């Protein structure tokens, strides 16, 4: 897209708008006034801009952004005041990392330009004490991507890249810090690709051979079970899982880290608790912590399949859960593929009715 922007801050807002951000959850700071001005100017000129939602603390701001992203599937954005606002995000930063949701977290940063040298340069004493060696380091290990906007950057491109990364599966938070003199730098005409023009990567399709193997194991299992946690992030997965469970007479249980409604809790095949040690086939679908290690964990002899957009859980340093196969796939796509395959196999186990009756007690 090509825009006329008085300063880099206007380009930041324009790129958010072009990237599908409709709400900016905002906690104010002296270096963040460019957001308010750019949004007000866009509205006055009849152009689209994110709606600025004012909050008085960063934890509810980021949690609100996560809730919006979870309920709509769209990216949300936040803005916080320099390093202290970034630290105020607190535990919500952890929630964002584990959420699988696209959120662009922004924060102002103090100017470092000497007084009088440029627009937005230091003009008050607090700017010296806000200056850190690495503000982004506060949240780096929790982010999919982070960047500090610099004078040589194309501000619209930086925002589009942030949204591209946040919205690419597995979705997650990204962080962009915006020094005041950079946000207020005169710009004029600016051209940049939108996040969609950069290209949001489509969810991975499951490996056909792996799906065939898992489907056969489930079809011919004596006691199959499926563990869920995050698959309900996409509501379309719920009826697919119900159909698969009913076709197989398969027990479904929430993992110890349940985060979404994945399966109807009043369905006869839903289990509040289950002893996985007696199951011969166990599938963990989008579940970070599928079960607690111990006597009720799957037997070493059981066939265990893990299906996830990040099946190896690369963000968790120590991860001891074993698996016979790990399949990289979006939960909804995997359920579609499994349903097709179990129907192709065509066999319904004679024990299916008995299993249904047993797990429904």
Predicted segments, located by residue:
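N-terminal alpha/beta PP-like core and its mobile active-site loop of ThDP/TPP-dependent enzymes
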Residues: 1-358
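Cofactor-binding active-site loop characterized by glycine-rich and histidine/acidic residues
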Residues: 361
């Amino acid at each position: 897209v090509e825009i006329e922007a008085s300063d880099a801050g206007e380009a930041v807002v324009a790129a958010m708008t072009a990237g599908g951000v409709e709400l900016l959850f905002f906690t104010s700071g002296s270096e963040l006034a460019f957001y308010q001005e750019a949004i007000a100017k866009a509205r006055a000129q009849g152009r689209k801009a994110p709606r600025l939602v004012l909050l008085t603390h960063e934890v509810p701001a980021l949690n609100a952004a996560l809730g919006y992203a979870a309920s709509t599937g769209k990216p949300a954005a936040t803005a916080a005041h320099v390093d202290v606002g970034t630290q105020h995000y607190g535990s919500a930063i952890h929630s964002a990392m584990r959420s699988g949701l696209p959120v662009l977290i922004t924060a102002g940063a103090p100017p470092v330009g000497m007084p009088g040298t440029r627009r937005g340069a230091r003009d008050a004493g607090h700017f010296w004490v806000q200056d850190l060696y690495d503000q982004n380091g506060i949240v780096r290990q929790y982010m999919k991507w982070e960047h500090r906007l610099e004078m040589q950057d194309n501000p619209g491109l930086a925002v589009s890249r942030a949204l591209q990364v946040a919205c690419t599966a597995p979705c997650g938070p990204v962080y962009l810090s915006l020094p005041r003199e950079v946000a207020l730098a005169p710009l004029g005409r600016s051209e940049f690709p939108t996040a969609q023009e950069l290209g949001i990567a489509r969810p991975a399709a499951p490996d056909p051979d792996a799906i065939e193997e898992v489907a056969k194991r489930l079809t011919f299992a004596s006691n199959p079970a499926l563990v869920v946690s995050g698959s309900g992030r996409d509501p379309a997965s719920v009826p697919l899982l119900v159909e698969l469970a009913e076709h197989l007479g398969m027990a479904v249980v929430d993992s110890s880290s349940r985060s979404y409604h994945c399966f109807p809790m009043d369905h006869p095949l839903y289990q509040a608790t289950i002893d996985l040690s007696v199951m011969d086939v166990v599938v963990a679908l989008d579940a970070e912590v599928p079960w607690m290690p111990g006597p009720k964990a799957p037997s070493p002899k059981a066939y265990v399949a893990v299906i996830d957009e990040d099946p190896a859980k690369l963000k968790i340093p120590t991860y001891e859960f074993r698996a016979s196969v790990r399949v990289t796939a979006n939960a909804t796509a995997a359920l579609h593929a499994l349903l097709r395959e179990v129907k192709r196999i065509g066999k319904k186990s004679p024990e299916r009715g008995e299993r249904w009756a047993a797990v429904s007690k």
